[in-house]
A protein has these predicted regions:
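Membrane-proximal, cysteine-centered motifs at transmembrane boundaries in secretory-pathway
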Residues: 343-353, 714-795
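Glycine/proline-rich low-complexity spacer/linker segments in large multi-domain proteins
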Residues: 5, 712-715, 781-818
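Hydrophobic alpha-helical elements and their junctions with loops/disorder across both membrane
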Residues: 240, 383, 755, 795, ...
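Conserved luminal/periplasmic juxtamembrane motif of membrane-embedded glycan-processing enzymes
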Residues: 1-727, 733-741, 814-819
Length: 819
């Protein structure tokens, strides 16, 4: 019963999504992951494995983007089950029961089944973990964390081939999930765990502890090798992208004040109920100017008191100290830019400089709290009248300390919340003044608005916190001293119910759902798709959001009928086509969410949003953007095709054949070796991109020379990994200019002859053709994928060798035993 309880409870917050009618939608789910999911699922079911996405960012590599999870077996399987809506919801949901099972396996190696179930539920249902559901790469990676710890604990106890294989497989799955911060944290955690926990470490056997670390490191390295099919392409793409230089690494740092929300959820604002950050003045002050990455960091008073009882009690000292240290390190690193510690690590320790969003380290704190809760529950199980667990004075002191802490903590929280709420009601003027001063200290210009907002919300939110805190105080006062078995069992039942119910109530709204009808293809895209080679542009869509301040943006956005808050924002994200691939609509200025696209693309995109309207128009004309979503004031006297839903003043306009076509023959070339100079030219006047192509080097003409024809080019076959173009060239050589992103992994043949692809106009591909008619084939053959696959194959063979070796060893042992 206990092993099944944890995964079943972890599913409860996600039950609304286990249908084919409603979709999980919060933030990145509706903006990016829904589109990625649909595009990949439809491609897979059609028999294609797309390595290149030809629709976003003028075409970009898909295999190297770990957010697609193209090589993570359970995620692939989940996305192919049932209909499109159910498959997506399963992709979002399944990490949490997986995390619960892994946590139970890990804890059950040291604690009772009941205590392990409490710990597993605490991990899988607490706010920080449930909040990862809006980013499947993060949630799948976090789900494997307890499995990696379970494998490490087995290796530390007995470094058999089976245990090494379990740990290697866990690390491989986490590596394939596509979240580098969690992977790095897990690797550090398991190595330190191997060095400090276990019989060898406890007996001060330095050689034995060293062997444990080496075994753990070897298994982890094998897991990384198995995942090289994803890791190597991602690393290669990172080296060519803006991520290799300077990226924003302090975003989504956790201000220490925000830790109050571990016991008082949404004290500083509820993102799901707001139309904009202006409605919740405290939220941007505490989360580096935006909404939080983790929408909840709630543990609750009962769970934290239970964890405090376990970590301060009589359990294994190394275990307790390890998780206290891990939890504190997770908290401090989550603070990011708000302490001098993380900036120092970011600037001087290489891996940290490549990671974004320090708040992700908070998942380690969640694991530490769950470990403490497991130990605390087992400590309560031992507190029964007639059982003497205080065999010496030191144990008695520890137990007394744990009892006082578990009682004093919830009492202090409940009293503090009660006093603060009373001050807001009965001493509103001086309290408002103090709150305004505090808000100004955090960066608010005036502070009065933030103070008034807090006074309004505290009055209605404080009562549940006070009630839960005082009930927890009473239960710990009852349970932390020896009682008769019946009283102890009944009290633990009440406490367990309180802990689980508190977590479930607070987790229920973290991953809301929305009617699937709002996720249908935007109707306005039907005009764009009428010309499959044309691209579109949505004015105001920049840096992953819609800006009313952008010169091309709508000056306002309205709620979808019947929707408000985050639900309306999700519907707006679909209308803005943040990820248009499933609808086969082409875009150039797509937001690069993982920061993995080539630097030339990011240079172009960054400059575009800083340019004048005239320079923007030149760029759009030269990059094949025929359809543009703009306010009427930015479209001149053009007649709009259709109004865009939820956009206050934007329409879809057709700029006709004035833009450069996707494929064309350009008669003249000019060598410009610097890529940045080529990109800059796209914005500048005095250059006809249809008559002159800028190439990075001269390449020889290719193709069977024939009779000169009127220059033309047209695409006759087009898929993700292959494009076939028919072209004709006049009496002089000419360049076939293909307005899809340049990559060294594309190969070209002309009439069956190998051709050299030049980088053209900074972003595109170009092939020089001889006079006459030609068939030009472009094939995508990424070398990084081949290298990664070869390494993965070697790793898989090593893993199979370990399994077979272990099987043979057990078979021989059985033969010896039976004889």
């Amino acid at each position: 019963m206990w092993p099944l309880m944890a995964p079943c409870v972890s599913l409860i917050p996600f039950l609304p999504g286990l249908s084919g009618a409603r979709v999980f939608y919060v933030r990145d789910l509706s903006q990016y992951f829904w589109g990625r999911y649909l595009w990949l699922r439809r491609a897979w079911l059609s028999g294609e494995w797309p390595l290149w996405d030809p629709y976003v960012g003028a075409g970009q590599a898909a295999y190297s983007d770990a957010l697609n999870q193209m090589f993570l077996p359970p995620a692939i399987l989940a996305r192919l089950i049932g209909g499109e809506v159910l498959g997506f919801n399963l992709w979002v949901t399944l990490p949490f029961p997986l995390a619960a099972v892994g946590a139970w396996l890990f804890f059950s190696r040291r604690f009772s089944a009941a205590a392990s179930a409490i710990g597993a539920i605490a991990f899988a249902v607490c706010g920080p973990i449930v909040s990862t559901g809006n980013a499947p790469n993060l949630s799948w990676s976090v789900a494997v964390l307890p499995w990696a710890l379970w494998g490490t604990d087995r290796v530390v106890s007995a470094p058999t081939t089976r245990n090494l294989a379990i740990l290697a497989a866990s690390i491989a799955l986490q590596s394939l999930a596509g979240e580098p911060v969690t992977l790095f944290t897990t690797l550090a955690l398991v190595l330190v765990y191997a060095a400090t926990i276990g019989d060898r470490a406890r007996s001060n056997d330095l050689a034995g502890a060293t062997r444990s670390v080496i075994s753990t490191g070897a298994a982890s390295a094998l897991g990384i090798a198995i995942a090289a099919i994803q890791l190597w392409p991602t690393i290669h793409a990172s080296s060519l992208a803006e991520r290799a230089g300077s990226i924003t690494t302090d975003g989504w740092s956790l201000r220490p004040t925000a830790l109050i929300e571990t016991v008082w959820p949404h004290l500083f604002g509820n993102f799901f109920e707001t139309r904009s950050l202006a409605d919740v003045p405290w939220m941007p002050l505490l989360y580096t100017g935006r909404e939080p990455l983790l929408f909840s960091i709630y543990f609750g008073v009962p769970l934290l008191a239970l964890a405090a009882f376990g970590l301060a009690g009589n359990g294994d000292r190394r275990w307790r100290l390890f998780w206290v240290a891990a939890g504190m390190i997770g908290i401090v690193t989550s603070f990011g830019a708000y302490t001098p510690i993380y900036p120092f690590l970011r600037d001087h320790v290489p891996p940290f400089g490549l990671f974004r969003f320090p708040v992700k380290y908070f998942v380690v704190t969640a694991m530490a709290v769950a470990a403490g809760a497991t130990a605390g529950w087992e400590g309560l199980e031992r507190t029964i009248a007639g059982r003497d667990e205080t065999r010496d004075l030191l144990d008695a002191r520890r137990l007394t300390r744990a009892r006082l802490l578990s009682i004093a903590f919830p009492a202090a929280i409940g009293s503090s919340v009660l006093l603060f709420a009373a001050a807001c009601v009965y001493l509103s003027a001086p309290t408002a003044g103090s709150l305004a001063v505090f808000a100004r200290a955090l960066g608010d210009e005036k502070g009065t608005g933030a103070a008034e907002w807090m006074l309004r919300t505290v009055r209605q939110d404080a009562a549940p916190i006070v009630l839960v805190s005082f009930v927890a105080t009473a239960l710990f006062a009852l349970l932390t001293v020896p009682r008769k078995r019946f009283v102890a069992v009944a009290g633990r039942g009440l406490l367990g119910t309180l802990v689980v119910a508190d977590l479930l109530v607070r987790a229920s709204g973290i991953n809301p759902v929305l009617n699937a009808a709002h996720f249908a293809e935007p109707e306005w895209l039907s005009h764009v798709k009428a010309y499959p080679d044309a691209r579109f542009y949505v004015g105001g869509k920049r840096e992953g959001s819609l800006s009313g301040m952008d010169i091309d943006g709508s000056r306002g956005y309205v709620d979808a009928p019947g929707l408000t808050g985050s639900a309306s924002r999700a519907a707006l994200s679909i209308q803005a086509a943040f990820y248009p691939s499933p609808w086969q609509a082409r875009e150039i200025l797509t937001f690069d969410l993982p920061v993995l696209w080539p630097k030339a693309f990011s240079d172009m995109s960054n400059r575009f949003f800083d340019e004048s309207s005239e320079a923007r128009e030149r760029l759009l004309d030269r990059t094949g953007v025929r359809y543009r979503v703009l306010p009427q004031r930015r479209a001149g006297d053009r007649v709009p095709l259709v109004r865009i839903p939820q956009f206050y003043e934007s329409f879809l306009f057709d700029f006709g054949d004035t833009v450069t076509p996707r494929v064309s023959i350009v008669p003249t070339s000019r060598v410009v070796a610097q890529v940045r100079t080529q990109v800059d030219a796209l914005f500048e006047s005095g250059w006809d991109s249809r008559a002159i192509v800028l190439v990075d080097r001269d390449v020889p003409p290719t193709g069977t020379r024939g009779h000169a024809v009127q220059p033309f080019a047209r695409i006759i076959e087009d898929s993700s990994n292959r494009t076939l173009v028919e072209a004709g060239v006049g009496p002089q050589d000419g360049y076939l200019l293909f307005l899809d992103s340049y990559s060294e992994d594309w190969r070209a043949t002309v009439d069956g002859q190998q051709a050299t692809i030049a980088r053209a106009d900074g972003l595109w591909r170009a092939v020089r053709l001889s006079p006459g008619r030609h068939h030009v084939e472009f094939l995508y053959r990424p070398r990084a994928l081949a290298v990664g696959a070869a390494i993965s194959l070697g790793g898989i063979l090593c893993l199979l060798g370990l399994v077979l070796l272990g099987t043979r060893h057990r078979y021989n042992a059985w033969i010896v035993w039976s004889s």
